[in-house]
């Protein structure tokens, strides 16, 4: 998509995705503390919160992964699918970094003709190659190997991101109660307008 080739659009996209994921993680951290049902711990769950911010981490991935800009939109689609298929593994501050590096790597492997191997992504993400391999496998099974993103789905997610970035331009941020998911679209996009109103707006 031509707009994604624009560096200013990509820097805004990175900033917005970081902000969104940070709010989702913080919201789920609070929910986790008061939740009566236990949340499953997975390979994505770190023992402690990483010291690097989500935005710095995503900028690092963008700088070193050298994947196509579309990978970041597709990674977002994958994260959304993952959270819907794995409701007991909501995005939080203990797993968001690992989910990010894994979703971008899987998106690059699926979309791009040329991409780096797992060892390279492990270095970029600050984890071991063995851990990167486990994360990839768990992520793929968590997605049910549903990696294809139709043009309609891609455009719907990208349009949503564009709209939200435009709304945040004046950066008057309003926080509203959130649900667990990021955004919900069906591949057929038949109920796109209705679903857009039900998206996460943290």
Curated annotation (Swiss-Prot):
One record GO biological process: cell division
Gene3D superfamilies assigned: Cyclin-like (1.10.472.10)
One Pfam family per UniProt: Cyclin
Entries under SUPFAM superfamilies matching the protein: Cyclin-like
Key word Cytoplasm present: no
Record's keyword annotation contains Cell cycle: yes
MF (Gene Ontology): protein kinase binding
Tissue: Expressed in roots, stems and flowers. Expressed in the shoot apex, leaf primordia and young leaves.
Keywords (A to Z) from UniProt: Cell cycle, Cell division, Cyclin
InterPro entries: Cyclin-like_sf, Cyclin_P/U, Cyclin_PHO80-like
Similarity remark: Belongs to the cyclin family. Cyclin U/P subfamily.
Complex and partners: Interacts with CDKA-1.
Classification via PANTHER family: CYCLIN-U4-1 (PTHR15615:SF101), PTHR15615
Record protein name field: Cyclin-U4-1
Organism from which the protein derives: Arabidopsis thaliana
